[in-house]
C-alpha cells in the first residue's frame, strides 16, 4: 500500500464491486483491537496463534424476577441465573436468552456465599453441574451457612417458551437503556428491556442454559435482541457520539467525557463513579506497556476489573458462583492483546452474495491434501461472513468513497477520475485549486 499504482488498482477493483452493489457501509458488531485502534476481519483472527487459552474470572449472576410463577416465589427470592466469562459486560445487560426447546427447572436452595434462601431457574441438563446430587436428599430447613453441601429441591419444570416474556430487575443499574428522538432528547427505554427472549443458539454444553445478553458487545446478542425489540445500552459523549459503555481505548467512559444532559438523565452517578475510567482488560492499561513492550505477566498478576465487579456482586448478593475458567479467546495479531467485540461503522464486501457459488466452485478444485478443501477452507466458506474492509490505520489504502451531508455518494475508481472530480468541484466553487495539477501530476504517469 506504499505504491500509488497498487492503491489505484484497488480503487478500480472496489469500484467494480460498488457498481455491482457488493460494497456497502454497515454498523455491526465486529472484532476490534483497542490496542491497535482498528477493527479486524475474520481472516485476521483465524491466523495461527490468534486464539489462545486464557484463564479468566467468571461469574453466575443472579437476575431477580419481577413476575415469577407461583412456585418460584414460595422459597426466598426468585432469580434467573446466567453465566458469563466477561463480567465487565454485565453492566450492559438488557435481556436474558433461553433455548425455546430446552427444558428448565426451578430449584429451591440457598446462596452459598450469603446463606440467603432463594429459588433459581436454570437448564435441567445442567442441574448436576451446579448442585451436588448428594445434597438432593437433604432437608432445606437443616442448612446452616458454611455447610459444604447446599440442599436443593426441584419445584417446577418448563420449556424455554414458558419463560419467554418474564421480566427481571436490572442487575447493575449504572446506566439506563435509552432511545433518542429526532430532536436528540433521551428517553428511558427500560420498559422494553430486562425480559427473557428466545434464541436458537443457546446450548446446554456449559453455563446455565440462560445467556446474558449485552447487544453492544456480541454479534449473536445484537441479533436476538433486535429480533425481540430489545434496546441496546449506549452512552452519549461530549463529541455527540453514541458509543457503548466502553470507549474505543477499552475503558469505561469517565463521567466528565459524557454529554451533560445524558449524564444527568441516564446515569446513576453514585454507582457509576466506582467504575468510571476502569480498563475492561488489564492489557489495555498503558501502565503495563513500557517503551512499546507489553508486560503480560504483570497485567495478569494485577487485579482485573472482572474480579472487582465479581467481588462487589458477591457483597451485594448478586453472585451465585464465582470461579476461574480457561477458555479460548481471540487476540490481535499486531499487538498480542485481546480483542473486544464492538459496534463499528465499517465498509463491507458482500461476500455472502457469492457464498453458494464459491462453495460450488470449491468442489471442483483438486485439493492436495483433499482435507484442506473439505476441511479448513470448506468450513470457512460454509460460515462465510461479509468481508470487513475498514481499518483505522494511516498506512492502509484510503477507501475511495465520497459522501455528502445529504447522503449523496460516489465511488472513485482511478486517480484520473479523482482528478476530474476535483476539476468539477473547482468549477462549482467548492474548491479553489487542484492539488494534483499544482504538483504537475498527470493521471496514469507515475
Name these PLM-found stretches:
Residues 1-6, 28-35, 326-330:
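Short, solvent-exposed turn/loop segments enriched in Gly/Ser/Thr/Pro and often Arg
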Residues 1, 73-80, 87-446:
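Non-cofactor substrate-recognition interfaces
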Residues 12-16, 60, 64, 308, ...:
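Alpha-helical scaffold segments in soluble metabolic enzymes
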